[in-house]
């Protein structure tokens, strides 16, 4: 399988993924196509907290982040095969359990925090906690594998990121939109696969929002952390907003690696786009 980034003139990612004693590129071990249908290796799929949306945890990634909390399935091929059609049916099944319908501009993780803090106090003890936003009726709160909260009308792709192989995401997005009446699609991403060409395809396929994890501003730090350049990742916010996607940016404070200087630079980048 030829690297789709290289075909577009970009550099291949740090995408070696392990399976037993062998290592291959993530797209070779966690993605396949049979009779025109794409299949993705999925570790799990469920209503997640504190995001309050249905998360699909993907195996394999184009980054090799030192701080990855999902390395057991992003850097190691681990999970079950799901076709894009099967994921579309999962989305339809989840839609029947949705308790909160969000407008498109709220298709972010951040907007989950002003709805519910996932403490479960209202369900377990019949009273709200001191930190409860006080917005939702108890009937909107459901239990998931990660705790209590609402179920928002959002399907999110998380875990490993191979958006560089955009055709899978385009096909699965179309399946989700076909199977659901009112469902938004969010991709949690490191941004490495968000080339202008790929963003055009994702927009045309029905993707609504990106949760972009900018891991560092300075390229030397980024490369040490993730194994790749961040050259076009820093351009991604502009390209995303230009195409009318919803954008949320995440940056983690990592002592001695990503501290105030890096976060200030990333903040200025965002501010220049949307003062």
Where is each model-derived feature located?
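Glycine-centered loop/turn positions within well-structured domains
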Residues: 63
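N-terminal [4Fe-4S]-dependent radical SAM core
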Residues: 1-58, 66-141
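Conserved AdoMet/S-adenosylmethionine-binding subsite of the radical SAM
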Residues: 137-275
């Amino acid at each position: 399988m030829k690297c789709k980034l290289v075909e577009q003139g970009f550099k291949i990612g740090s995408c070696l993924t392990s399976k037993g004693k062998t290592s291959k590129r993530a797209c070779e071990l966690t993605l396949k196509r049979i009779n025109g249908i794409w299949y993705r290796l999925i570790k799990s799929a469920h209503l997640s907290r504190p995001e309050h949306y249905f998360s699909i945890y993907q195996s394999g990634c184009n980054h090799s982040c030192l701080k990855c909390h999902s390395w057991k399935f992003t850097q190691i091929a681990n999970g079950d095969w799901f076709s894009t059609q099967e994921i579309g049916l999962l989305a339809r099944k989840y839609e029947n359990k949705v308790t909160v319908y969000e407008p498109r501009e709220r298709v972010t993780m951040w907007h989950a925090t002003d709805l519910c803090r996932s403490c479960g106090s209202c369900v377990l003890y019949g009273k709200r906690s001191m930190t409860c936003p006080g917005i939702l009726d108890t009937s909107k709160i459901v239990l998931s594998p990660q705790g209590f909260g609402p179920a928002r009308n959002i399907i999110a792709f998380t875990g490993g990121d191979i958006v560089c192989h955009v055709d899978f995401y385009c096909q699965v997005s179309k399946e989700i939109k076909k199977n659901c009446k009112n469902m938004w699609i969010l991709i949690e991403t490191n941004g490495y696969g968000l080339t202008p060409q790929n963003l055009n395809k994702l927009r045309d396929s029905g993707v609504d929002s990106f949760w972009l994890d900018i891991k560092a501003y300075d390229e030397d730090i980024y490369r040490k952390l993730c194994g790749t350049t961040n050259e076009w990742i820093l351009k991604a916010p502009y390209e995303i907003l230009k195409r009318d996607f919803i954008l949320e940016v995440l940056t983690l404070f990592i002592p001695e690696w990503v501290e105030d200087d890096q976060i200030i630079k990333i903040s200025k980048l965002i501010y220049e786009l949307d003062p």
